[in-house]
Amino acid sequence: MLYYALVFFIVALIAAIFGFGGIAAGAVEIAKILFLIFLVVAIVTFVMGLVRRR
């Protein structure tokens, strides 16, 4: 589970670079939304991995 949390976090960072960096000017809003979605998924997956280990 922690592997997936890391993957989702990396995807969120990539979406943030495109959305907040202005690289993809036409898709800024979509990249910002994807950043938030993948950041939430990464946090949830990380917490589930920690809970499952106990």
From Swiss-Prot:
GO terms for cellular component: plasma membrane. It is found in: Cell membrane. InterPro entries: DUF1328. It is a multi-pass membrane protein. Its main location: membrane. It comes from the Bacteria. The chain crosses the membrane at residues 5-25, 30-50. Disulfide bonds: none annotated. Keywords: Cell membrane, Membrane, Transmembrane, Transmembrane helix. NCBIfam families: PRK13682.1-1, PRK13682.1-4. Belongs to the UPF0391 family. This is UPF0391 membrane protein Rmet_0093.
